[in-house]
UniProtKB/Swiss-Prot annotation:
Keywords assigned by UniProt, alphabetized: Alginate biosynthesis, Calcium, Isomerase, Repeat, Secreted
Hemolysin-type calcium-binding repeats: 387-399, 406-422, 424-440, 538-550, 557-573, 574-591, 695-709, 714-730, 732-748, 1229-1243, 1247-1263, 1265-1281, 1398-1414, 1415-1432, 1536-1552, 1554-1571, 1670-1681, 1688-1704, 1706-1722
Further comment found in the protein's record: Each enzyme of this family of C5 epimerases introduces its own characteristic sequence distribution of G-blocks in their substrates, explaining the extensive sequence variability of alginates. These alginates of varying composition have different physical properties and are necessary at different stages of the bacterium life cycle.
Name the record gives this protein: Mannuronan C5-epimerase AlgE3
């Protein structure tokens, strides 16, 4: 319908004020349900409203303003207007407006003739509130001469389009997009505006700017930027085509935004940059023409720059990363510095491909980011960099060439196809290059290292020496060697299956670089695959321009005036001769000078050949002058360099004043002021001339060392020696000397005992002031001491003084002169001195020399121990036991064992069986190790070989272990470097070999353990250790037992047979300790053991390969609560000898009772195994249905099993006859923002929470983004995009969490919506999805228009236009059905949600993964849901029935019901709940064995059958109604009467019966019924008549009477708000009555049949008010007939009390309150619950729809108001609007922010309201009431 404004009085004469007339036309169109308001050609003058937010004209829903054309119809502000106008035409503030707009006219702000700020167009909802304007269209609109903004759609608008419009000569921006969602600016022009042409701000997203033009603006042509620091940045914005030129600042500026694409635009002639990316992420600049910018100064055409807001409002630093520039044609102006430039401010990860750049002045490209790249070739895909987090990441590349950065954490990186660069970063990483020529880059030595106690070594799994490379160029190693002096050693593990590249030199933290490679690469490393130093970039003798890359390189300029730029990486720049300009770029660079002529100056001749360093970074870069002989900074003389600042303060010179024969002196300069910043640490100086020996005299000398390695000899006298830097040797000589080593590894040498001694009367003890036990040594090798001891017998006693400030090494044996050797050390070194830092003499100690006999009878323990102690005292050695049997006894304490080995001592015999150490007969003590290391001491470099330990178990009674070593469990320390070879341990009652807790680098090889009472071999917390070529047999428990945090452990070619437990077990040691991890089991055999061949229990990252496992009692291999286990290329056969088991069993472990955890077995990889079953073997490979999942089975050969080759229950487990294409079949994200990339295999990618990016790569993949706003790319192959919950992808009125599918192929890809309940395509309502596109047709949306309780509407987006292409072939709405027939069927589901229909027959249904529905149908069926939330549905009684008379049992059996997840659907059968099995209920019955629960009815059908099914397990006390889907009980739940005299009869169900007014007869029937009375007039009497209701069957045992809405307080005498209980004389009727009447003479009375004199307050509900509470959103709460309390909470709520005396409290937000019938209270608990701010325009005033004077109350007691008045001093004013339709209660004072309390009452209450209608803070009544006919003028808000 059209509404011509001239019909409403508008003149359009350019003089008259037409505001009212045009607004009247708008209002009329709105009242008619919508229409077009037409303005014929003319000039229509308009004025503003009372407030800025009123604008001039307010447009409303479904109304469009249309003119005769731009310039023909003009709406113009009146002259002289002085008040701000936030939108000449606008939508109403605080109201959601939709389907409106404007076209074919001009808005003129008349800025020259008024003084106020006036904006042109404005629309939008309240910032931060839940709401939005929608579907707004502006076409062919001109906005000009505004003093403010032109087009200003503002905050929370969805689907706005502005096209073919113009903004010019406005005071601020031409076009603004402020929080626009799904909008379009198309074919618009913005010119000559004072600020920006286009300004996109404040969370705007999913927004398109197409073919717009901006020129001649005072700011930038187009800006996309953050609006406020606490709001999300704009994102997902496409700028396509158009032109941005001749603007004063940038053509396009992208500032603090992300995911923006700028393409196909022309950008030229702008004052600053053509394009500036400023603190933005993931921006694409594609195929643009950018030229002739930088008109106002020297700038790059394209600048990439980070934004430092740390001192600003947010406190954040916004790094520009992930910028992609491709296919742009860039040409510079005379001022343009670079074509593309990164600032050196953290900007990084820029990717430049195939850009054409010319005409720039300084260089085409300048990149500083260490990970930024440039190529002249087109890219192979956008994702050039995959970056992890600080956590443990799994990153997988695609078929492209990628850079994969793990960063911190223990990461798994897989390059996939392509020539990739993998950089694990910090943490213990696993690196797999995949196909292609890959580079494994190490950027810092600490990225891959080990210490003495832990390994953080990276593992390369698939190094190809013929094409892959290891880049070590950033680490400073010089090549391969012995691991010292900057070289790397190449070693292999004992089995030759792993190669190590390692340095033996530690840093200050004890870290030594090491990497590991799977496989043997000895002899295969060369310059082609190990990059120690990047190939040099060399110049010529001419003037060269050399540029590095992002690697560490050496740039050699040679002769000429060269320009060298290192780029990223740690570079070395050598300018050579000539005057060179040196720029290091990013990284730690070295500027090296190899000759004086490299940088020199002749002040006499005026010849300046000094080099110039542009960007020297203090603390990172260095200047190397070591080749020139300069030794330090100084005055520039005598081999020193002076630092001199020029007079301008902008250049620093480093120079020598010493000239050569030609008059030249060395000099270089640095750009900038480095005074006070340069120190010796910024230089590499020459080592001062070496002084090999600094010798003193016989006097008291003070000797000072230098930075070299020196020998300081004090000779006689009391000397003071200080070694300085370097590894020095200090020998004080005679007398009392003070020795200070200084930095470096120093040796304190004592050449004679008399060099340092004391007597009884005097001390001549030398003092060492700074001994470092980690690197320094004390050399006593020439003094004859044998080691540590008690100070006697050639030993030294270690003693610390009482204060703990000084340590002494002393002999207590004096020489002939009474002198006892002694030295002192400053500090407490107890426990820190050992053979590693105190040098004694070592040798071989024969036990027989110490009294051992070896005769098989004598106790040789003391003699052997004496030999051990002597070897230790001598600094280490070998204790040799010749052939014989050496009996030993225990020492008494179990922890002392029999023999105690010590540092540096090895126990060696004549051979196994030749030398036997045997426990004496009759020993009854517990012995924790016949041979062991000391408890609580760190012992290193010790072991045992070529002998037998015999525990003599038949002739002893204590628990005896053979070998034991280790440190205190849980403490910081470890035994180290332990070796046992050719040792037999037998006949122990306990363990054989038991290396225990915290041992590093232990090797046991070629040894045997047999006939022991527990395990043969134990590995308990071993690190970097090996068991090799050992045999364990006939032990009572396990052959090998690996426990307690053991990691980096190898078991190679071991054999275990005939043991009473398993052959090999790897398992957790205790619930509070880390699990064993990173263990390789390679080769060997495990057979004929009583339990499993190999058991892996509560462990992770284990590989079992190349072994033969057979003849064992249980499974060959059992995985029990493990993660990431590989079982590869084994022979597993003929196991399950003792019981029916699978050959390979995968099972989860329920440890809730101990640790509280459930350990699911996941990530198992089984490939290439040959498996053959025995007569008992059930399956070749079986998963238990207990949460075990993500198993991947490839190319295994299985035969001879009895039940089936494979049984998998995991929803994500897979099996294939083909070899696997990679280990990772499932990629799973975290709760953060993840980037997951698939490979060429078929994979499932699970994003989980967070805003994830999933890329399937090749293969037929399943992508499930999970919660968050995800970007899904299927890649090659037929991919499925799965949505598991509606909240995985949705939008609300104000925010979008919509997932985006970037590459949907309707011919092969599918979208799986089967779990969401949608029925198909449609209009978006009634369970259908609507297909729409964005305005440009470049994006398709699948959306529901129906919101859930939280306001969420399901929606997904697809890049591209798929209208007409989406159908049943690519959209999965319904779960697929798997159907049987009338026979006995076995139906197996898959990992998706399905319906399994068995139909008739005795069927077996297994849902496997997914949320399945299982319907067995007729017959006795077995139902297994599998993983997921499954529903077991029964459609007929005959689906599961039993006849107890005939014995026919057709009951179904459910094997795996999961309480809290699965459901039992009996709704079709009419059962209404759990009960006694009668009257439509079901009863739960447990069988006598307690292992099966029956769900049954006791009511037989006509054929004698009753419904019954069973569940495996005991569910008594676990199953409740919530686990069932029951039928709705028959009959109404609420029986509601009318106003007449009703007769209401209940049923057997529980009902609420409300007769309402009238004299009603009420009967509840069976069940627990409630008789409700909401108002006094529901049941009452007067003096002359009775209208009392009668309850005929009140059951005091279960019924109740609800009086909560009437205000009675309890039973009493009928007065004071109580009710009297009275029985008539015949005892046939009981009355509840009040004797207090209301004004109409009505008093409550109720009759009940029978004598109910026993009624008490337990049968009556007096004040049990139900609370209905909303949330923080916009809630609608509706009460019933009872008295309720309705709490809205935050948000704009709608509260309706219904019947009853209700309390309504809207809370914060603009609420609508309706009490309904009854006496209601409208309560306000905070002044901001209902307020208005006339300054800001905020209107949050609550409205009461049905206030009733004399019945309802308004409760203001919490706010402090004392009465009615003028609105000041604690009173409220009553104000009536002009129309007399609304009454306001107002506080005219307000708070400090200008917020004024205000309530609106619908209707005219001005003459009725008085103090009796309120609950004030005090009882003060108002003395006067001010009634104002119209609203007074308020202060005007500033918008």
């Amino acid at each position: 319908m059209d509404f011509n404004v001239k019909d409403f009085g508008a003149l359009g004469d350019g003089a008259s004020d037409d505001t009212a007339a045009i607004q009247a036309a708008i209002d009329a169109a709105h009242a008619a349900g919508g229409g077009t308001v037409y303005l014929p050609a003319g000039e229509y003058r308009v004025s503003g409203g009372e407030e800025p937010s009123d604008g001039a004209l307010t447009i409303k829903s479904n109304v469009y303003i249309v003119g005769a054309g731009m310039g023909e119809t003009v709406i113009k502000m009146v002259d002289g207007w002085t008040q701000n106008v936030t939108g000449m035409v606008r939508s109403a503030y605080g109201e959601e407006t939709s389907n409106f707009g404007m076209s074919d006219l001009t808005l003129d702000g008349n800025r020259d003739n008024l003084s106020a700020k006036v904006d042109g167009w404005f629309n939008g909802y309240i910032p931060g509130q839940d709401g939005a304007d929608r579907d707004v269209t502006l076409e062919r609109v001109e906005i000009r001469e505004m003093s403010g903004y032109g087009f200003d759609p503002h905050e929370q608008t969805i689907n706005l389009t502005i096209r073919d419009s113009v903004a010019h000569d406005n005071g601020l921006d031409g076009f603004v997009a402020d929080y626009q969602v799904g909008g379009v600016f198309e074919n618009n022009v913005s010119y000559n505006n004072d600020r920006h042409g286009f300004n996109i701000v404040t969370s705007t997203n999913d927004f398109v700017l197409s073919n717009n033009v901006a020129y001649g603006n005072g700011g930038a042509g187009l800006v996309v930027q953050r609006g406020s620091y606490d709001l999300p940045h704009p994102y997902d914005i496409l700028i396509d085509g158009g032109a941005y030129y001749d603007n004063a600042l940038e053509g396009v500026q992208l500032k603090m935004t992300h995911d923006v694409t700028l393409q196909n635009a022309e950008i030229y002639g702008n004052g600053l940059y053509g394009v500036r990316v400023y603190g933005a992420q993931d921006v694409q600049l594609l195929d643009n023409q950018i030229h002739d910018n930088s008109q106002n100064g020297a700038y790059a055409e394209v600048l990439l720059q980070s934004y430092d807001d740390t001192a600003g409002v947010s406190g954040n630093f916004y790094v520009t990363t992930g910028t992609w520039l491709e296919g742009n044609v860039i040409s510079g102006s005379a001022n343009s510095t670079f074509g593309i430039q990164e600032r050196a401010d953290g900007t990084d990860y820029s990717s430049l491909y195939a850009n054409t750049i010319d005409g720039v002045q300084n260089g085409t490209v300048r990149l500083y980011g260490a990970n930024s790249t440039v190529s002249e070739q087109p890219s192979s895909g956008q994702q050039a960099t995959l970056e992890g987090t600080a956590g443990n990441d799994v990153l997988s590349g695609t078929g492209a060439h990628e850079l994969i950065l793990g960063l911190a954490g223990n990461d798994r990186l897989d390059g996939g196809a392509g020539d990739d660069t993998l950089d694990g970063g910090a943490g213990r990483d696993t690196l797999t290059g995949g196909a292609g020529a890959d580079t494994f880059r190490f950027s810092a030595r600490e990225d891959s290292h080990r210490t003495d106690s832990a390994s953080f070594t990276d593992l390369i799994t698939d190094f190809d020496a013929s094409q892959d490379r290891i880049d070590l160029s950033a680490l400073g190693f010089t090549g391969l060697g012995n691991g010292y002096d900057g070289t790397l050693a190449v070693t292999t593990g004992s089995g030759g299956t792993r190669t190590y590249l390692k340095s033996y030199e530690v840093d200050a933290q004890g870290r030594r670089f090491e990497i590991a490679l799977d496989g043997n690469f000895v002899g295969q490393f060369n310059d082609g695959n190990l990059l120690f130093d990047a190939a040099p970039v060399t110049g010529t003798e001419g003037n060269d321009n050399l540029s590095g890359t992002d690697a560490g390189e050496t740039l050699l300029g040679y002769g000429g005036n060269d320009t060298l730029n290192g780029g990223a990486g740690n570079d070395i720049l050598v300018g050579g001769a000539g005057r060179d300009t040196l720029t290091g770029g990013a990284g730690a660079d070295v500027f090296r000078f190899e000759a004086l002529s490299d940088s020199q100056r002749n002040y006499t001749a005026g010849d300046n050949q000094g080099d110039y360093i542009i960007d020297f970074a203090v603390g990172e870069d260095r200047i190397d002058v070591s080749a020139l002989g300069y030794t330090g900074l100084g005055n520039g003389r005598n081999g020193t360099l002076a630092v001199v600042l020029n007079s301008a303060g902008d250049r620093t010179y480093v120079k020598s004043y010493d000239t050569d024969a030609n008059g030249y002196n060395f000099e270089l300069s640095l750009a900038g002021n480095y005074q006070g910043l340069l120190g010796a640490e910024q230089f590499v100086f020459a080592t001062p001339p070496e002084q090999a020996t600094i010798e003193g005299t016989d006097g008291n000398d003070s000797l000072q060392g230098t930075g070299a390695d020196e020998l300081l000899l004090g000779l006689g006298g009391r000397d003071s020696l200080n070694g300085g830097a370097g590894d020095d040797v200090l020998d004080g000589g005679a007398e009392r000397d003070t020795l200070t080593g200084g930095t470096g590894a120093d040796t304190f040498l004592f050449s004679a005992r008399t060099d340092s001694y004391r007597t009884d009367s005097a001390s001549f003890t030398d003092l060492i002031t700074d001994f470092d036990p980690a690197q320094d040594r004390i050399d006593l090798s020439g003094l004859g001491f044998s080691g540590f001891g008690n100070g006697y017998d050639g030993t030294l006693l270690l003693q610390v003084n009482a204060a703990g400030t000084r340590t002494y090494l002393k002999s207590l044996e004096a020489d002939a002169d009474g002198q006892r050797f002694e030295i002192a050390l400053d500090g407490d070194f107890s426990g820190q001195l050992d053979s590693g830092n105190v040098i004694f003499e070592a040798g071989v100690f024969n036990a027989k020399d110490f009294g051992a006999l070896g005769d098989g009878a004598s106790d040789d323990r003391p003699a052997i121990q004496a030999a051990i102690d002597a070897a230790y005292a001598a600094g280490g050695g070998t204790v040799y036991l010749p052939a014989g049997e050496y009996r030993v006894s225990p020492t008494g304490d179990p922890g002392d064992g029999c023999l105690m080995l010590k540092d540096g001592v090895y126990l060696v015999g004549a051979g196994m069986g030749e030398t036997v150490i045997k426990l004496i007969d009759g020993s009854d003590q517990k012995i924790t190790g016949m041979v062991r290391s000391a408890y609580g001491e760190e012992t290193s470099n010790f072991g045992m070989s070529d002998l037998t330990l015999d525990g003599n178990r038949d002739n002893t009674s204590g628990k005896v272990d053979g070998w034991f070593n280790g440190y205190i469990p849980g403490q910081d320390g470890a035994d180290r470097n332990v070796t046992l070879e050719r040792v037999e341990i037998r006949e122990m009652s306990g363990y054989g070999f038991d290396p225990h807790e915290q041992t590093i680098n232990l090797t046991i090889r070629d040894s045997v353990a047999h006939d022991n009472g527990l395990d043969g071999f134990v590995a308990d917390y071993l690190v970097d250790s090996v068991f090799e070529n050992n045999v364990a047999y006939n032990n009572d428990r396990h052959g090998f037992n690996v426990v307690t945090s053991t990691y980096d452990f190898t078991l190679s070619n071991n054999v275990a047979y005939g043991n009473g437990g398993a052959g090999l077990v790897i398992q957790r040691g205790a619930e509070d300790l880390a699990q064993p991890t990173d263990i390789l089991i390679d080769g060997g055999a495990y057979y004929d053991n009583a339990l499993e061949g190999v058991l892996l229990k509560m462990t992770n990252n284990i590989t079992l390969q190349n072994a033969e496992i057979y003849g064992n009692g249980y499974s060959g291999v059992r995985l029990y609560g493990t993660e990431d286990v590989q079982i590869l290329n084994n022979q597993i056969h003929d196991n399950a000898q003792n019981v029916a088991y699978a050959e390979v069993l995968l099972q989860s472990f329920n440890d809730v009772g101990v640790s509280g955890n459930f350990y699911a077995t996941t990530g198992t990889w089984i490939e290439g195994n040959v498996i053959s079953g025995s007569a008992n073997s059930t399956y070749g490979i079986e998963e238990r249905n207990d949460g075990t999942d993500y198993s991947s089975l490839y190319a295994n050969t299985i035969d001879g099993v009895q039940t089936g080759a494979v049984r998998l229950n995991g929803a994500h487990s897979i099996v294939s006859d083909q070899p696997g294409t990679g280990q990772q079949a499932t990629l799973e994200g975290t709760t953060g923002n993840d980037t997951l990339g698939g490979s060429d295999a078929h994979e499932t990618l699970l994003g989980l929470d967070g805003d994830d990016r999933l890329d399937g790569g090749a293969g037929n993949d399943i992508l499930d983004g999970g919660v968050g706003r995800d970007t899904l790319t299927g890649g090659a192959g037929a991919d499925t995009f799965r949505f598991s919950a509606r909240e995985d992808s949705y939008r609300t009125a104000s925010t979008s969490f919509t997932d985006l599918i970037t590459d949907f192929d309707p011919a092969q890809d599918r979208i799986d919506l089967s779990a969401l309940g949608f029925t198909g395509l449609g209009d978006g309502y009634d369970g259908t999805l609507l297909v729409t596109t964005g305005s440009g047709g470049s994006r398709t949306y699948l959306k529901s228009l129906e919101a859930d309780a939280e306001g969420r509407r399901f929606e997904i987006a697809l890049d591209g236009d798929f209208v007409g292409l989406l159908d049943a072939s690519n959209l999965i709405f319904e779960r697929p059905a798997i159907e049987g027939d009338a026979g006995d069927n076995a139906l197996l589901g898959t990992s998706v949600a399905e319906t399994l229909l068995g139909h008739a027959g005795n069927d077996t249904l297994d849902g496997a993964g997914g949320d399945d529905i299982l319907v067995g149908g007729a017959g006795s069926d077995s139902l297994t849901g599998g993983a997921g939330a499954d529903v077991f549905r029964f459609d007929a009684l005959s689906d599961s029935q039993r006849n107890y008379d005939t014995g026919d049992n057709q009951g179904d059996r459910i094997t795996d019901f999961a309480v809290g997840e699965d459901k039992l659907d009996v709704s079709a059968l009419g059962f209404t709940g759990l009960g006694d099995g009668y009257n439509g209920t079901l009863v739960l019955v447990l069988n006598s064995a307690g292992d099966r629960t029956y769900v049954k009815s006791y009511e037989n059908g006509a054929d004698g059958y009753r419904f019954e099914f069973s569940l495996d397990g005991n569910y008594q006390g676990l199953l409740g109604n919530e686990d069932f889907i029951f039928a709705t009980p028959s009959g109404q739940q609420l029986l509601e009467g009318t106003a007449g005299n009703d007769s209401l009869q209940g049923t057997a169900a529980d009902e609420v019966i409300h007769g309402g007014s009238g004299r009603d007869t009420l009967a509840g029937g069976a069940g627990a019924d409630v008789f409700r009375f909401s108002e006094l007039t529901d049941s009452y009497r007067t003096d002359s008549a009775s209208y009392a209701d009668l309850i005929t069957d009140f059951d005091a045992s279960e019924d109740r009477i609800d009086l909560s809405g009437l205000g009675f307080s309890g039973l009493g005498n009928g007065y004071g708000g109580t009710l009297a209980l009275q029985v008539n004389s015949a005892g046939t009727r009981t009355y509840l009555k009040s004797y207090e009447a209301n004004a109409a003479g009505e008093r409550f009375e109720l009759s009940l049949d029978g004598d109910l004199s026993g009624l008490d307050e337990s049968h009556l509900v007096f004040d049990e008010r139900v609370v209905l509470a909303g949330g923080d959103g916009n809630d609608t709460l509706s009460g019933g007939s009872a008295a309720e309390e309705l709490l809205g909470g935050a948000g704009n709520d709608s509260l309706s009390g219904g019947a009853g005396n209700d309390i309504l409290d809207g809370g914060a937000g603009r609420d609508t309150l309706s009490g309904g019938s009854g006496s209601d209270i409208f309560r306000f608990g905070d002044a901001l619950d209902s307020f208005r701010n006339y300054n800001s325009g905020a209107n949050v005033t609550d409205s009461i729809a049905d206030f009733t004077h004399g019945a309802d109350l308004i409760d203001l007691s919490a706010l402090g108001y004392t009465g009615l008045g003028d609105g000041y001093n604690g009173t409220l004013a009553i104000v009536l609007n002009d129309a007399g339709t609304k009454t306001y209660l107002k506080d005219r004072g307000g708070d400090a922010e200008g917020n004024r309390f205000e309530i609106a009452l619908e209707g005219n209450h001005a003459d009725q309201l008085d103090a009796s209608d309120f609950i004030f803070a005090t009882a003060a009544a108002a003395t006067g009431i001010e009634v104002v006919g119209s609203t007074p003028a308020e202060e005007q808000p500033v918008v």
